[in-house]
């Protein structure tokens, strides 16, 4: 259900950005994707939901399968080892713009 959650989060961020005039960032931390929509549906839904003021950053943790469509859609995508707490923390902070 990662894909539908990402679409909802991006749509919410786009609404927030439009309402405030500020840019918004969506950070997704995932261990893999349970596909609830195919690649074409996901890409189309994400294109409909997003705006120029929203960025999507994804941190993929561990050895699970990387969602190629999510990776392609992300403005930034990082894969980290789940056993390296420092690397994980750094990747999340970077994705969040901290």
Question: Where are these predicted regions, by residue range?
Answer:
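Von Willebrand factor
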Residues: 1-25, 36-37, 59-66, 86-91
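Short secondary-structure transition/capping segments
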Residues: 11-14, 72-75, 98
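VWA/integrin I-like adhesion module and closely mimicked acidic/polar interface patches used
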Residues: 32-83, 90-95
């Amino acid at each position: 259900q990662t894909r539908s959650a990402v679409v909802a989060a991006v749509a919410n961020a786009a609404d927030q950005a439009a309402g405030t005039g500020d840019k918004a960032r969506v950070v997704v931390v995932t261990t893999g994707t349970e596909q609830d929509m195919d690649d074409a549906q996901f890409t189309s839904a994400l294109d409909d939901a997003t705006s120029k003021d929203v960025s999507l950053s994804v941190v993929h943790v561990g050895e699970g399968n990387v969602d190629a469509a999510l990776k392609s859609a992300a403005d930034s995508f990082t894969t980290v080892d789940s056993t390296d707490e420092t690397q994980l923390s750094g990747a999340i902070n970077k994705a969040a713009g901290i």
